[in-house]
Every structure is written in structure tokens, then in C-alpha cells.
Amino acid sequence: MEPRPARLGDDLRRVARAVARAHERFVAQGQVTESAVRSVVAESWRRSLDRGVDPGRESAQLVLSATDLAEARESVPWAAALPMIRSLLMEPAADSGHVVALGDADGRLLWVEGDRSLRSSAERMGFAEGALWSEDAAGTNAPGTALAIDSPVQIRTHEHFVGAVQNWSCTAVPVHDPATGQVIGVIDVTGDDSVASPLALTMVRATVAAGEQSLALGPRTGPRAATPWRLDVLGRDRADLHRGDTTTRLSARHSELL
């Protein structure tokens, strides 16, 4: 009898088991030798260990009171792009079993929206509005690590440094000020393994690019502020951002990201 051909799911599970073993050894010995551990993850593990993050911690730290959270939301530089981000990413997440988090440049989660039952589960590990998910505070995780290295990041299950987070996968992309290039926040999608897919990364990058372009164009006010956004990125050299009967062509840099 011929052996059953390997499936993608089998490969992912095999890699996950190898990463889990590597994580156990790293926590015990402080060294990574397994090739199954991606370099971006190994480097993040080392930073997490150097910062004294406890891999056995049960929950992230809540650092913002309700009043502080409201003030942080008002002062975050990209707040004007929130309606677009909701339309392109957060509202669809509620129907797809995912959670979307928007954080500031310090890794504090200012908005966490999406699937209601999944949000309740995420809150038990401290993935909630007002919590601090910087890499220095919470170890290897997509939003924190994306901010730490200023680059899109996908973290799968046992690649997380803290054990309590290892049932989750996530994709995060930093947000930049279009005028200065400075990091001003991060957008993250959290859920099962499907959120660490190439498609999920494309969707988050597209949303960030559209948000940055929106900031460059200036705030939208008046009746059109509630009009839904739509982003077209396929089959064209430059991505188009639609709102009602108005179409805005994204910059070449943002289109290249998509």
C-alpha cells in the first residue's frame, strides 16, 4: 500500500510541533538551534528574553483606564482613518470569526472589534482595549513585533513567546505618518491559523495603505463621512479607493505594497 501523500495541513502541524519543542528548549536554555524557527521569530524571542518577559504570564497588562483610553483614542494621529478601517477590515472580521485590533505606536490596543465570542476568549489573555501588547511587555506577538521591527509580521501559535497566547495566530502591519514616515500605530488581525495566511497579510497591508493614503488626503467630514469605502487592488497597476461615486487612485508606493 502506497503512503498517503503529504498534505499542507500535515506540514503545518509538523512545523508547529517543531516550533513548540524549540520554544520549550529556548525558554529552558536560551538558545535556538532548530531550523523550523523563522529568523524573525528567533530574534524576537531573544529580545523578549532580554527584556525579562515572563513566558508563563497569563494575561497582558491593562495600562489604560476608561478615561485614559478615551483620551488616547482622540489623540492618536490616524483616528481620522478609523471609519475607512472599519469599513474595509473590522466589519468583515465580525462575520469571519476574527478579531481586529488597532494600536498606537507604543503597542497599546485602542480598539478591539470583530467576532463577539472570539473577543471574549481573547480578553481572557488580556487582548483587550487598553492593554499593552508591545514586544517589550508581552513578548513575541504580531502587533508588538511589527512595531519593534517596523515591518509586517505574521506570528503563528507556538511562535508566540508567552505560552498563554500560543493557541492564537495573528497578522499585523505598522501604520506610518504619510508626511514623515514615522510609525504612528499598528493594525492587527487575530484568530485561528487562517489569519496568518498570505491572503490575510494582503488584506491588512491593503487596509493600512488605504488608511495612510486617506491621511495624506486629509480628513473627511459632512454627510459623506458615513459612506462605505471599497478598495480595488486586482488587475491594475495602481490601487483604487472608492467611496460613493468618488474614486481616489492610491500613490505608487502604496500600490506597490499591495
Task: Say what each PLM segment does.
Residues M1-A131, T145, L201-T207, S214-P219, ...:
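Intrinsically disordered, low-complexity terminal regulatory regions
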Residues R73, D192, D245:
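Conserved short-loop catalytic and cofactor-binding motifs
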